[in-house]
Amino acid sequence: MESPEWIVLDIDGVLIGIESSYDLAVKRTVEKLWTKLGHDGSISLETIRDFRKKGQFGDDYRVTEGLTLAGLNEDLKKFVEEFPRGEKLECIINRTGERVGKEKVKPIFDRIYLGKKDSPSEYGLWRQEKPLVDTSLLDKVAEQFKLGYITGRSRQELRLASKVLNHELSDAVTREDFLKPDPRALTHLVGESSGIYAGDTHNDGLLVENYNEETEGTFDFVMIDPDNPINQVLRDLLDKK
């Protein structure tokens, strides 16, 4: 792609490190649900990250429910290792014949991640998030391209991300709009255009694949990981402009 019109970025794991926030909120929620269901166990942060990267979940409520169900019925580490890339929560529900339900996951997860004024200090994990991106690069990208964001966060959580970065994240699609990998998330933001989408999971790649198949637009996907960090990707884009 010679000159993309849009640069679209995921937020969690790309712009913001979530190891001590979302990852930990999933862990604590899964373990609390297991206790309520009479199961004694623990889950590693590595297992959570591997599971999220492989599956087609859209938000961490679904990640949490999937891990809760899997751990009740199977060896969790083996389950995640063998989990088919791109599969959904429904695959686990069908396999186990059970479900937990968002209505049981969300109150626990939100209290841990968002916190409450009357909560113990362990809650409000969003405060532990750290920027991964040099926000001056976002400003430079916005001068050269159209810049937007697609995230599994809610609008409330998006505002918290802006606080963490001390940078306004405008032109954003949140989970109230569409869940990835629904291509309408990208269409809603860019229409049918050319661009680059940077994310850190297989689900992000599926979003781009679905968009290219179902619209006249053309997007390339860039996987962000420790060997290909977002700051380097943005610098390379600016150098090529």
Predicted regions and their residues:
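Asp-based, Mg2+/Mn2+-dependent phosphohydrolase catalytic module
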Residues: 1-7, 126, 133-141, 148-150, ...
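Active-site neighborhood of HAD-like aspartate-dependent phosphohydrolases
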Residues: 1-49, 62-65
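Flexible, glycine- and charge-enriched loops at secondary-structure boundaries
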Residues: 19, 57, 179
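Short alpha-helical scaffold segments that flank and stabilize functional sites
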Residues: 28-32, 67, 71, 164, ...
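Solvent-exposed amphipathic alpha-helical surface segments
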Residues: 33-37, 71, 75, 237-241
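Generic macromolecular interface patches on structured domains
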Residues: 35-40, 74, 168, 218
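A metal-dependent, Asp-based hydrolase signature
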Residues: 52-146
